Amino acid sequence: MSGEIAMCEPEFGNDKAREPSVGGRWRVSWYERFVQPCLVELLGSALFIFIGCLSVIENGTDTGLLQPALAHGLALGLVIATLGNISGGHFNPAVSLAAMLIGGLNLVMLLPYWVSQLLGGMLGAALAKAVSPEERFWNASGAAFVTVQEQGQVAGALVAEIILTTLLALAVCMGAINEKTKGPLAPFSIGFAVTVDILAGGPVSGGCMNPARAFGPAVVANHWNFHWIYWLGPLLAGLLVGLLIRCFIGDGKTRLILKAR
């Protein structure tokens, strides 16, 4: 079973997994178009969140934020470089939202991507629990986000998550999707953005930037205190980045206003 699309039509996943067909059109198998990208998002999310959770659970007191910041950033850059050509390398519902808004992901794939990322988050967190000593796991609350302890911290944490995720989503959308600015260093830039964000924002909000990263450990450790912050903040940032690129900083093909005549 396969479908046919015009050569100029954007792909949902890997734009290289195509075969020439009759009349100058491309034939893409349903598996490569719909299923494979979702499997890759699940796999990449699981690997990234496993490494991230383990780095928090096994973090020593002498390393502070440096160990989780480097582990998250390097792991994300690695999985993007390895798997990004298949799915776009989002591994984050907020990034998928921003990518969809600027034309980097078809709308019909947004929900499947989200489901895949959340399942990957649960799998990665469960694997981190499986390989960790029980005492360390519970001392770290299963790598769930526990930075916000009281109502007075909520506003600062929410604003921090919006700003931190904006930087990350900009790194993805401008570095890997926008035609005028994308380049081969995108995986490095995206991973570096995560590292910088955690180092800077960790004491304020935990530096999540990713609902799947928050959701997986929350399920496994059953820790839901102030969990909504790590959904609302990143998703608002995804909307903001989509608006910025569509209206102001995107290339001529992406921008909806202020086009040259």
UniProtKB/Swiss-Prot annotation:
Motif mapping: NPA 1: 92-94
The record's account of how the chain is modified after translation: Sulfenylation at Cys-53(C53-SOH) when hydrogen peroxide flows through the AQP8 channel, making it susceptible to hydrogen sulfide produced by CBS. Persulfidation at Cys-53 is required to gate AQP8 channel; under stress condition, hydrogen peroxide accumulates in the cell leading to CBS activation that produces hydrogen sulfide inducing persulfidation of oxidized Cys-53 (C53-SOH).
Gene3D superfamilies, per database record: Glycerol uptake facilitator protein
GO cellular component terms listed in the entry, alphabetical order: apical part of cell; apical plasma membrane; basolateral plasma membrane; brush border membrane; intracellular canaliculus; intracellular vesicle; mitochondrial inner membrane; mitochondrial membrane
Swiss-Prot/TrEMBL GO biological process terms: ammonium import across plasma membrane; ammonium transmembrane transport; B cell differentiation; cellular detoxification; cellular response to cAMP; hydrogen peroxide transmembrane transport; methylammonium transport; regulation of cholesterol biosynthetic process
Cysteine persulfide, modified sites: 53
Impact when changing residue 72 to A: Does not affect hydrogen peroxide transport activity under stress condition
Motif NPA 2 in this chain: 210-212
The protein's name in its UniProt record: Aquaporin-8
Organism: Homo sapiens
